[in-house]
Swiss-Prot record:
Disulfide bonds: C7-C28, C13-C33, C17-C35
GO cellular component, one term: extracellular region
Domain notes: Has the structural arrangement of an alpha-helix connected to antiparallel beta-sheets by disulfide bonds (CS-alpha/beta).
Chief subcellular location: secreted
SUPFAM superfamilies for this protein: Scorpion toxin-like
Organism field: Rhopalurus junceus
Protein's recorded name: Potassium channel toxin alpha-KTx 2.19
Keyword Cell inner membrane in record: no
Length: 37
């Protein structure tokens, strides 16, 4: 699931995904965070 959080590295997405979806599985794709459940 892509969330509206800008990123340059996956590490930036981990807290965002944890907050948004309760998952720490995150990637940075095309400058946006992507969370995996």
């Amino acid at each position: 699931t892509v969330i509206d959080v800008k990123c340059t590295s996956p590490k930036q997405c981990v807290p965002a995904c944890k907050a948004a979806m309760g998952t720490v599985r995150a990637k940075c794709m095309n400058g946006k965070c992507k969370c995996y459940i």
